[in-house]
């Protein structure tokens, strides 16, 4: 596996790349890195693909603009297109996890000419509407803590998470994993609580995340901090206006959805299972793969099962 630096105007993008063949471009979520795709890079490179994974702007070795507006879906989708074009493929299969899923879904709709197929992990496609997700749930969470609302105040979450980066990451990764009790991430807490309140730092740590793996993330976030990554949560409020031209538009490319059975995303709206019909807004949906016992970090917690699901999807293209 090699690392290359590509550019979208003034934004430098650190990209891991391996193999030769049709391009699969993987886009990570929060709080992760291109490293989150280590199991997929190796596996699909050995099966005749060029596999690339980018550090999203704000993360790792990529540029870290300060302004919130730099982190809109439109801007990050342009980064994705720049990576595809500069690798020289012209077109790519996109795979995205967590915030990476809305990024690849949006790229597929905004730039259909460069996206041949799309796989979303953990977050189903939800077309652009008049309000952002965080604003749509403010009333639901008016009397309790919700992490996306907590993230809106600049500097607050950054200070909490950067006070002890190793402990913060250990708690975050465990809390959203299939190994944690079901209610840890969405535990009912007072409105004025902090993100890490009530989160466990388990010992020993689950085997899917080794000490060496954790060290990669810790060193990256010691360098980058958390402002850029959290700015994506703030910039979502700008997306409806910026993406008004594609409001309500479906994904038309071949698509699939993959998630862990115990993923917290499915319960973000109390009383609703967001994984019930993940292909509702996709016109060529090829199937949903829900992986037993896995949590939010599905491609790391269950790499063999995730790779098998992706391979099934790819074989039908």
Predicted regions and their residues:
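Flexible "cap/lid" subdomain of the alpha/beta-hydrolase fold that forms the substrate-access gate
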Residues: 13, 59-95, 99-286
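Conserved Rossmann-like nucleotide-binding pocket used by diverse enzymes
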Residues: 26, 52-55, 95, 119, ...
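Signature tryptophan residues that serve as conserved aromatic anchors
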Residues: 30, 34-37, 99, 105, ...
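A short loop-to-beta-strand scaffold at the N-terminal edge of the catalytic core in hydrolase folds
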Residues: 8-17
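Glycine-rich phosphate-binding loop signature in dinucleotide/nucleotide-binding domains
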Residues: 19, 87-90, 317
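Conserved HGGG/HGGXW glycine-rich cap/lid loop of the alpha/beta-hydrolase fold
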Residues: 16-63
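Catalytic active-site module of serine/aspartate enzymes centered on a nucleophile-bearing elbow/loop
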Residues: 283-317
